[in-house]
């Protein structure tokens, strides 16, 4: 419809007015492009093509281009107006991928500003259309029933606790034994389950030979194509959710659905990413079932019960609400969008995730802390910090044709209100997580791009080395040949990868050393891709002589993972401290067990008998001097006073910190008297020692003042809270360094001076420690430390009185100028509490007559009026 629109101009340069169709996965982009090219009777790459990462099948004449979301975002960096694109179609939008939400928001922004002619289409078979239509300004909603065949849904009668691969293998066997024709598509959550399912089917001795084909995103294109190619045998395709949407596999009439998927989630509070095995939503289950009805009536076998189906979530959680947002926030900063929480999203991201991403980017040095007016106000500086003085410079943002609404005109030109640093602009050119791009930017400076690219490839996928059990001692001993350096666990991985490559990724040879041959092959592919990217977008510059050689790669790893800097607590432990008050334990298999400082590329949480443990892996030893040279603005030195709990004294120490993590300390010969006093006071507030002289009288004075402040708010009295007491003690302890000195200090006088004698005299009037009582006696009051009760009403002070002695009392005692009654606890002659009252006359008239008979009987020696 869009391609053949008569209003669409045709007399234009090749490539102008293209239609771009976004697909959530590379497999889908390739497969759908091939299908559409076949339907349009044109070679793939001519009128219809696709472009995915490292694979471009387009030409100047391509009018329909299928791409993944990352490609469109890359185009937006290079050409923020998308000047050669007429329409952007978001296919399978119900999956709510992170980059699809970003791309839609940016496309909408572009349409509302400089490209009102840009057409935006959002498509899905299961999407709830109304919210999206409203987000796009109330756009029309078109419904097409399409051509689909009926699909019978079959659930389990009872839950099955067996491994999901075993259940799937049994379901395949039933289909084959029943003689039901048609290809079989099995959905599994990951590669391990795919291999287990194929193994179960091979072991089942099926009565019919099947073409068993795995399908997942890590396979090379030629192996993925086997799932779509004709076969003389019935096909059994075992796939991840790459086959859930977009692609049609001709001949599939049976779907076996595990109902599971691996979902990436990000814990913004702890900064940990996890890959969790979770039940899919009902919408995803419907999509999977639909694969059985594309070319003929089919059957979907769900490996869960019908009642269990109703308990599943209706739709997927948008990825933007559960993902690490660092890469997206970097992109938005490049477009002049400094606050992602105020951007016009379809669904708002978690503010805590945005804040975590911002902090990471600032830590990596991608965002300027403070941008001088000369850098962004008039746009006269390049990303490398040099001035633009040539008025004919084609990248000059002050060119009259440039826009001034916060968008980029050139991929390397800073924009008004953009606060990316020169490092940030370089990172932006590398489509990968900012940790890896920062590592490669540093590698370009130090002259070790290939080694850094290999490290990025090793850490960006699954584990290369198998986790060893108790029975794998022979593998552990054989693997020792990889551990030739105690500088970095990456060196171990690099040697293991080199071994796999030298053995031509032979599965049996790799298995003997606990190396995953298939993963090593994927590392090789990723390494080549990253190397190609880095070679295109980064210029390797010769390193300074002192930083060449053995230090170069560890420095790069430090640059990329500096926010995960760890300090060993002492030489005899694996326990470590990290920034932001975090802690963890170095993995026992790490070779970096002697390093006092290291960065951890892997942080994961495991369960133990003592509770959750944060495990620090893929460690690289670093030096304090490297941190100071690479991140000078984040390293501080200050003399601080610390309390030594062992020796019960205060010491002055010079602390060198990266952010809040102590890197080094040096004891100082002298202490500052006031600082030492404050340190002792803070130690007391943390219950590190006791103060016998901080007695009941002082505590009661604090409680009296706080209660008066609560009852008489118009006086605006400052409360005596924990902070005030710490301040008072700090003054009292000035010049002291030992606990025994603090315990001998005259605290009562210090407390009186702190509060002021005038205030204490006033306090004795409105909230006295004791009140006149029945003549010359004084009645002591006990003031509560909590000034208000559960209903936020002021808590009255209390006093114990003997019931038989107060019949002469005419008026109930009150404090705070009559605003608050005293709570009288009426006691028996032996002192036992009977009742409490806030109104003695009312109690005497209404309640006492009911108590009197029992009191007369129990205490006959006393007079009961």
PLM feature spans:
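Extended active-site and interfacial segments that coordinate phosphate-rich ligands
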Residues: 79-94, 258-266, 271, 275, ...
